Amino acid sequence: MAPPEKCGVHEKLMIYYCTIENCFSCPYKNTECKLNKNIAKNITTWGQLCEKFYVWDYSTNFWYSTTPFPNFDVILTNTRWFYDNGVRGIFNNAITHTSGEFGELRAYLLTRIYQDPLMTEQEYYAHMDKFLQSYYGSGWTYVRQYIDLMEELSSEKHWTCNAPPSGIFNFDTVAANADKINALWDSAEAAADSASILANVQRSRLAATYIVQSAIYDDVMKNGSQAEKEAYYEKNQELYNEYLKFDVAWNERDEEIEFSRAQPPCNW
């Protein structure tokens, strides 16, 4: 919501600015992004008008909660920008169920950032690496490489927190990197130090399998042999079974999966 132009704000009034319509791929302050063209002026002006200025931000996809949500490269930039423009606090609307992506990592990083919004980028990524090492064990570097790769693959598009997978990623680009994505997670699983670490790796891998299976669907159905199609269907079945095994919420609306092994996961 744009701030008023001809009146002030009462000192007892609290303003919560919602970012739901903005781009989660670009920094909010990037006015060249078509989804963020108004937020810079709005945040700056509200910060000048209102003492009790807060932000309602987002860090998950409520419609497609198991698709990758690659916003790690803008979290710190956005939080520091809010702080510099008079925001007094942030309510982060995130995943509330068992995460099939990186919900735990985001919770940790957001806690650190909100305690110290002026931390350096080097400190931020040191916190990330510390968590990854603790949560994913010896194979954490493969998970970090995957995170960096998905940030890169999602940079082609501008997307909101309710965007479909095809609105976040170019499926052709993801398909071209499918082998690399799978190899990184295979390596992370192989390096798991314990059963609990392996479970963490496998649960977080669900989002990777989800986007790969969604991205390669058209090519497999159009050009694949019958054996390749059967292998695709079997992988979908395995993915569905893993969702049930780890009790991962399909989306934040508590809707059940409309599973079909013959359809890409983004259509379930």
Annotated model-derived regions:
Residues C7-G8, Y28-T31, P68-P70, L105, ...:
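Surface-exposed beta-strand edges and their flanking turn/coil or helix-capping segments
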Residues K34-T141, Q145:
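Structured mid-domain segments that build the active-site/substrate or prosthetic-cofactor binding neighborhood
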Residues M1-G47, D57-Y58:
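Gly/Pro-rich turn-and-neighbor structural signature
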Residues M14, Y54, P264-W268:
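Generic structural signal for residues positioned in beta-strands
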Residues Y16-T19, S25, S59, I75, ...:
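Catalytic cores of glycan-processing enzymes that make or break glycosidic bonds
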Residues C18, W56-Y58, G89-I95, F246-I257, ...:
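A generic structural motif
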Residues I113-W268:
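Catalytic domains of carbohydrate-active enzymes that cleave complex glycans
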